[in-house]
Amino acid sequence: MKIRPLHDRVIVKRKEIEAKSAGGIVLTGSAAGKSTRGEVLAVGRGRILENGEVKALDVKVGDIVIFNDGYGVKVEKIDNDEVLIMSESDILAIVEK
């Protein structure tokens, strides 16, 4: 199945990150909490401004992004990956390499 986001929506695949406690113990499962990083899989055309113009999004396919846990709408697994649909404004930062 292929999903194409509309307007300023972005499709993000959660990326698992290794969580460690303050003492250096690797946390797993619910102790680690939900990842707030993900890879952008698809982007919409852009945000429609009040004057009708379309403002292109700052994020692009392949970007690794940071977002608040709880943002976005969880979609059934696509190609065995849990994906989220969210507005670009829900994304806090792009991780630069």
UniProtKB/Swiss-Prot annotation:
GO biological process, one term: chaperone cofactor-dependent protein refolding
Source organism, top-level taxon: Bacteria
Signal peptide limits: none
SMART domains: Cpn10
Annotated CDD domains: cpn10
GO cellular component: cytoplasm
Main location: cytoplasm
Protein family: Belongs to the GroES chaperonin family.
Function: Together with the chaperonin GroEL, plays an essential role in assisting protein folding. The GroEL-GroES system forms a nano-cage that allows encapsulation of the non-native substrate proteins and provides a physical environment optimized to promote and accelerate protein folding. GroES binds to the apical surface of the GroEL ring, thereby capping the opening of the GroEL channel.
Protein name: Co-chaperonin GroES
The organism of origin for this protein: Sodalis glossinidius (strain morsitans)
Lineage: Bacteria, Pseudomonadati, Pseudomonadota, Gammaproteobacteria, Enterobacterales
Gene assigned in the entry: groES
